[in-house]
């Protein structure tokens, strides 16, 4: 039992229950049929308790659909369904058939009467409506017209057996296909005179019926089985009656057939060709572009085959057009493929353009359709999200500066709208560590070109495009990011790479002042090697040496030697301590404070004094600091992944050349300066020795007979003047250790 029978059974059972006075107590329903539920319709409850309805069926169905929120459209005169044998039944009276109840062909619908009692109480619309359609043998389709939901009501296809008298079932089918169907075309690629391929479209000689019409030839019973709605069935029957006739003046033998041939070229030429080549055939003009050919089967078949070779349609010139898509190119391509199968559509990469090849008339129709349906896609408003990143190791302000430089670049396209793939690049994070981040491929452009492209992109940026906002909270060391989800996701990907643990460098510094005699007592050959004490002299930077403590027992050990010289008074320990720096650490000086030569150093060791000068000015007092004595500064500490330490060290020995008094400020101050600086690289735990910072001290002593030694001219004969010059050299011993 199919769905239709089940629905009919449900309707009959419901009506029988409504009209029954009493129900026998012995009746048992063995099977309960489930009413079909259409998921495309609404399940809103409807009530139709009208008793015996005698009004027009169209009004009844429209009111039910309207109560559920639908509009209705009828494909035919649905009120003619109440006709019985050409009469309209209203209660006990009978009215004559009028033209208002006829089909478009002028023939009334002769359908059996249907029940007119309707009793639905709070029934779901998607169950009641399919039941009504099945009871009245109707078909429906849900369509969208603007913002309204419309139910399109039509006749359910019916089957008709049409007997034939004079022509065969195959001939009748061929004529029906040519008359009611559409000719099929094929695309052929040929070569022109320049041996270049070009595309042409030509008919295949075959025809296809619409999907609503099915015709099957029954040759054994000489009839046609037709499946269609009533309107199409009547049209097909009328057409067959027109061609199923005996030819006047000649009796068609039992082996004779009749064919309908649709002319492709000139009709007069084909007609004359058939009359000259096949005089035994009867050829008559049929419709606007067809010929009816009757005669012996073999002659008709040979004529049809020969016409397929000589009857050619005129060549349709292929025209090419370029169309620029406003919306989505994929959607427009799919639309053209569905509406115009013979039209060749070729997308041009990502440019949003389509190349259309086809007949001029077809192209004009397609372009007119695109002008109506191709609209720019609505621009979705960008959604703004916010996220807080808690930093553990890096400074929020430094990470903010790094991210702002990254997000300032357009990561999607350059000025030519070409997609730029991201490439991994080794960079330095906010703490000076080496890290790998993804940045746009610059494609070899110069900095000036990049700046010009960035300005052009900024000018072309839509109004609804916003830049990400980054706020550094110094108190909690947090980074607040506000922007689109894509921008926040990009920041979330970069933050873990920047917020990493930074290794520290512990530098043990020992500064030893050795006089000239002590240096001679050391007996060092500055070009020799003593075990693990590798010595080298570089011009202008003093003495640089690398000491390996693990090999100290095999050669010379500097630390016990310096200690022994201290006990003899030949050397003096100026500084012995350690400082700790972070890898990549920048200056420790506060912005806007006093400035001196060590302002940009990551760490400093000083032994001596400081001269502060306050210079008044219109913008405010300017404070300058001059450190004298011994100054040791460390710049740009860096720890490589393999543990290698790189430092830039600068050592200075400054001494005032003249005594500084209050009257000499703020005039020119004269200092003697001895300076050495170098960038050194050594392994974890190794020791570096720097030497060559010379200092010179001159001491003058006067002695003699009091009063007489101070007389001018002859005073030198009664006294003594002793001048002693002492030169000393500073040794700086540095041992670096990586602390993680």
From Swiss-Prot:
It comes from the Bacteria. Disulfide bonds: none annotated. It is found in: Cell envelope. Residues 1-20 form the signal peptide. Keywords: Signal. Pfam families: Secretin, Secretin_N. Coiled coil: none annotated. One of its GO terms (cellular component) is cell envelope. Its main location: other. GO terms for biological process: protein secretion. Belongs to the bacterial secretin family. PANTHER family: PROBABLE GENERAL SECRETION PATHWAY PROTEIN D (PTHR30332), TYPE IV PILIATION SYSTEM PROTEIN DR_0774-RELATED (PTHR30332:SF17). Could be part of the type IV piliation system (T4P). May contribute at the cohesion between the S-layer and the outer membrane by forming oligomers. Could also be the main channel through which trafficking is managed. This is Probable type IV piliation system protein DR_0774.
């Amino acid at each position: 039992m199919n769905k239709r029978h089940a629905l009919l059974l449900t309707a009959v059972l419901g009506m029988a229950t409504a009209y029954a006075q009493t129900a026998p107590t012995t009746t048992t329903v063995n099977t309960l049929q489930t009413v079909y539920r259409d998921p495309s319709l609404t399940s809103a409850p409807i009530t139709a308790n009208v008793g015996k309805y005698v009004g027009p069926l169209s009004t009844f169905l429209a009111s039910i659909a309207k109560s559920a929120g639908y509009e209705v459209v009828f494909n035919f005169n649905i009120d003619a369904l109440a006709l019985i044998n050409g009469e309209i039944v209203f209660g006990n009276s009978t009215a004559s058939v009028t033209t208002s109840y006829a089909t478009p062909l002028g023939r009334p619908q002769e359908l059996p009467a249907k029940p007119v009692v309707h009793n639905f109480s709070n029934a779901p619309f998607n169950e009641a409506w399919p039941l009504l359609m099945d009871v009245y043998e109707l078909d429906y389709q849900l369509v969208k017209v603007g913002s309204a939901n419309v139910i399109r009501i039509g006749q359910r296809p019916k089957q008709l057996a049409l007997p034939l008298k004079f022509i065969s079932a195959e001939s009748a089918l061929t004529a029906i296909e040519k008359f009611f169907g559409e000719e099929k075309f094929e695309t052929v690629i040929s070569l022109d005179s320049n041996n270049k391929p070009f595309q042409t479209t030509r008919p295949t000689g075959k025809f296809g019926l619409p999907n609503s019409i099915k015709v099957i030839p029954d040759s054994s019973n000489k009839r046609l089985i037709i499946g269609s709605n009533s309107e199409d069935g009547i049209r097909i029957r009328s057409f067959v009656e027109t061609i199923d006739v005996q030819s006047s003046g000649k009796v068609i033998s039992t082996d004779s057939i009749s064919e309908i041939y649709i002319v492709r070229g000139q009709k007069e030429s084909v007609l004359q060709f058939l009359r000259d080549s096949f005089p035994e055939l009867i050829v008559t003009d049929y419709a606007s572009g067809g010929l009816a050919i009757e005669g012996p089967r073999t002659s008709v078949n040979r004529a049809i085959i020969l016409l397929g070779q000589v009857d050619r349609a005129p060549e349709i010139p292929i025209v090419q057009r370029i169309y620029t898509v406003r919306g989505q190119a994929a959607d427009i391509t799919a639309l053209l493929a569905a509406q115009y199968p013979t039209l060749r559509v070729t997308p041009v990469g990502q440019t949003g353009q389509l190349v259309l090849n086809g007949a001029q008339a077809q192209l004009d129709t397609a372009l007119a359709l695109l002008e109506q349906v191709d609209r720019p896609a609505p621009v979705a408003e960008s959604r703004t999200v916010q996220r807080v990143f808690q930093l553990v190791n890096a400074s929020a302000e430094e990470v903010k500066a790094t991210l702002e430089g990254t997000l300032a670049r357009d990561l999607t396209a350059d000025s030519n709208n070409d997609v730029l793939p991201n490439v991994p690049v080794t960079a330095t994070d906010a703490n000076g560590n080496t890290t790998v981040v993804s940045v746009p491929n610059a494609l070899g452009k110069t900095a000036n070109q990049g700046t010009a492209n960035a300005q052009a992109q900024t000018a072309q940026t839509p109004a609804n495009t916003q830049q990400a906002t980054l706020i550094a909270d110094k108190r909690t060391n947090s980074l607040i990011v506000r922007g689109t989800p894509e921008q926040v996701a990009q920041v979330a990907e970069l933050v873990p790479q920047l917020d990493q643990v930074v290794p520290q460098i512990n530098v043990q510094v020992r500064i030893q002042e050795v006089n000239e005699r002590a240096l001679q007592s050391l007996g060092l050959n500055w070009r020799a090697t003593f075990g693990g004490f590798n010595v080298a002299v570089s011009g202008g930077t003093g003495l640089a040496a690398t000491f390996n403590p693990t090999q100290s027992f095999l050669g010379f050990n500097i630390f016990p030697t310096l200690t022994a010289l201290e006990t003899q008074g030949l050397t003096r320990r100026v500084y012995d301590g350690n400082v700790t720096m972070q890898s990549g650490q920048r200056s420790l000086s506060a912005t806007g404070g006093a400035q001196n030569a060590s302002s940009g150093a990551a760490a400093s060791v000083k032994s001596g004094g400081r001269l502060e000068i306050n210079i008044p000015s219109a913008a405010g007092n300017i404070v300058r600091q001059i450190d004298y004595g011994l100054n040791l500064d460390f710049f740009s500490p860096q720890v490589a992944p393999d543990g290698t330490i790189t430092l830039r060290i600068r050592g200075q020995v400054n001494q005032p050349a003249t005594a500084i008094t209050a009257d000499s400020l703020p005039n020119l101050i004269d200092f003697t300066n001895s300076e050495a600086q170098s960038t050194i690289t050594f392994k974890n735990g190794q020791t570096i020795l720097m030497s060559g910072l010379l200092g010179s001290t001159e001491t003058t002593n006067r002695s003699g007979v009091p009063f007489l030694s101070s007389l001018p001219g002859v005073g030198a004969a009664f006294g003594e003047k002793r001048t002693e010059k002492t030169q000393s050299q500073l040794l700086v011993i540095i041992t670096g250790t990586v602390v993680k």
